[in-house]
Amino acid sequence: MCWPPGMAWSRLGEPVWVDFNQGLDARLITPETASLLAGLHWIRFVRLSCDTSAMLPVIEQAAAYLREAGVAPSRLWAYVLVQDVPDAPRRVLALEKMGITPFAQPYRDYDGGEPPNEQKAFARWVNIRSVHNSCTWENYNDTRRRTRNGR
């Protein structure tokens, strides 16, 4: 049996379906690793993580490598850690401009406390696509956004 290079196969000769659900570190994606990743059967998305604005150029390069290797643009997806709300919209819009679907996650510290309402409202604006596509973050009017939960 001849398999494509980089394809993951089980011992029974069946393709292995993968899902790196915590987000791949874009800094580790080279043309070679992108080629290997493109050869995998993905359950859904190729997930990357964008915790800070400093990661945007790195993610842009990794996405280019993945596209060149044959990963469909519709499969590119990125977690956006929402800790600094004023910085988060810029990251979301930059990812969308790159053709990457963002998914906002409010920052939850180690004590397990609830994230601030502003972070949760931002995540709703990003993750509910109909809302996100209908208005900008600045024009998003969520009454829960206006109430502070003391954090």
Residue positions per predicted region:
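Core AdoMet radical
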Residues: 1-62, 73-83, 101-106
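Auxiliary Fe-S-binding modules of radical SAM enzymes
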Residues: 69-71, 79-151
